[in-house]
Amino acid sequence: MKLTGLLSLALLTTLALAAPDPKKNGPNRDWCGQVCTGKNDCSGECNKCVNFVCKRTSVLIYKEYLHKNATDHAARLNATRHLTIMIDETTRVDHVTVKFNVETYGMESITRRPEA
């Protein structure tokens, strides 16, 4: 009887481990890791299909915002240099730079930090 119980437990554990991860394979296409076919079926930050998996390859550029709102030419150049941030599956956003830019240029949000 104990052997049958152990076999049942082992089978349930195996099935649980083999279950698809809803974060990666669910209907929410904003999670990186979403399965894709390459026909624009990734969205949000995870907007590029690479080998049937959505990847994060967003380029966030705030030049338009800064050119309309910066007070002088030097501020525009400085802001543009600091606020062009590339995000991909390996890059991490520097929170010190983000905080500096938000405080200096009055932007509410630049980007969320990619998951580790």
Swiss-Prot record:
Signal peptide: 1-18
Gene Ontology CC terms: extracellular region
Localization per record: Secreted
Keywords: Disulfide bond, Knottin, Secreted, Signal
Disulfide bonds: 32-46, 36-49, 42-54
Superkingdom of source: Eukaryota
Record's comment describing the protein's domains: The presence of a 'disulfide through disulfide knot' structurally defines this protein as a knottin.
Record-stated family: Belongs to the UPF0499 family.
Protein name: UPF0499 protein ATEG_06693
Source organism of this protein record: Aspergillus terreus (strain NIH 2624 / FGSC A1156)
Taxonomy of the source species: Eukaryota, Fungi, Dikarya, Ascomycota, Pezizomycotina
